[in-house]
From Swiss-Prot:
Keywords: Chloroplast, Cytochrome c-type biogenesis, Membrane, Plastid, Thylakoid, Transmembrane, Transmembrane helix. It is found in: Plastid, Chloroplast thylakoid membrane. May interact with Ccs1. This is Cytochrome c biogenesis protein CcsA.
């Protein structure tokens, strides 16, 4: 009872804090002079990370197994993984962290929000593990898969953002004075040239906009590649450990179960992405298109197959059936 109450409190605290963080970040995206609010939002994300960590540890203690046995617990773990990626980019002092946090922070809150919504209420009290899940491979296989999903989803969203920014016609900036623009574009000042009775704006302003856009695209491409590479490693380890576990449980390394099939498709898509990165002609938008396709494939693999209620890995209608 105590653990259940503590879990309930942590769930609501984490969701409330991260909701405030999202509101603050929307304000900072529109009004860039609110430095204090930006710092507060990062402190809020740190607090959210510890709340979700406490929530997972609490379930681990009173359930006596790693909380990865059903959809609710895996969503909590996915939200926790998103928050790790967010904090990693923050502590790395990434100069365009605000743009990255516009992806990682909402990913955390939407995942956390769905996990704690009424749809999964019956899963909050996890039943005893079925025999197939009572294995030390549960921690290895599922944790690697979910970490892989989190990294690949974030990397794919960076690629989607890259495509949107590349093809948008103009960057609109909301500010109160030119000093903000100067700081944002890393230029000392916007110069004006007086020619007779006319004031001609120096083209450095327009160049600075293009420079900022180019730098942002390069950074998104850089982080997308790094995070997807990390996620691909996690996914590969998860698939291999799952094959070993399946052989111990069912006597076969691979059964072409729907979940296994879509995991293989996901792995193939991102293998193609990483292969395209070896050719400089395919960097940027071309590789980002492949990663964007992977975003949809991941959700089908992770979530869609479970809702169909078929296969060995399915959670059915939010009810655990087997591994």
């Amino acid at each position: 009872m105590i653990f259940s109450t503590f879990e309930h409190i942590l769930t609501h605290i984490s969701f409330s804090v991260i909701s405030i963080v999202i509101t603050i970040q929307l304000i900072t995206l529109l009004i860039n002079e609110t430095v204090g609010l930006y710092v507060s939002s990062e402190k809020g994300m740190i607090a959210t990370f510890f709340c979700i960590t406490g929530l997972l540890v609490t379930r681990w203690i009173y359930l006596r197994h790693l909380p990865l046995s059903d959809l609710y617990e895996s969503l909590l773990f996915l939200s926790w993984a998103f928050s790790i990626i967010h904090l990693f980019t923050y502590f790395k002092k990434y100069k365009n962290h605000l743009s990255v946090s516009a992806i990682t922070a909402p990913s955390t809150i939407f995942t956390q929000g769905f996990a704690t919504s009424g749809f999964l209420t019956e899963m909050h009290q996890s039943p005893l593990l079925v025999p197939a899940l009572q294995s030390h491979w549960l921690m290895m296989h599922v944790s690697m898969m979910v970490l892989g999903y989190a990294a690949l989803l974030c990397g794919s969203l960076f690629s989607v953002a890259l495509i949107v920014i590349t093809f948008q016609k103009a960057i609109r900036i909301f500010c109160k004075n030119n000093n903000l623009l100067n700081a944002l574009f890393s230029f000392n000042e916007i110069q004006y040239i007086n020619e007779g009775n006319y004031f001609v704006r120096n083209t450095s302003f327009f160049s600075s906009k293009n420079y900022y856009k180019s730098q942002l695209i390069q950074q998104l491409d850089h982080w997308s590649y790094r995070i997807i590479s990390l996620g691909f490693i996690f996914l590969s380890i998860g698939i291999l450990s799952g094959a070993v576990w399946a052989n111990e449980t069912w006597g076969s390394y691979w059964n072409w179960d729907p979940k296994e099939t879509w995991a293989f498709i996901t792995w193939t898509i991102f293998a193609i992405y990483l292969h395209t990165r070896t050719n400089k002609n395919f960097e940027g938008v071309n590789s980002a298109i492949v990663a964007s396709m992977g975003f949809l494939i991941i959700w089908i693999c992770y979530f869609g197959v479970n809702l169909l209620g078929i296969g060995l890995h399915s959670y059915g209608s939010f009810t655990l059936t087997s591994n």
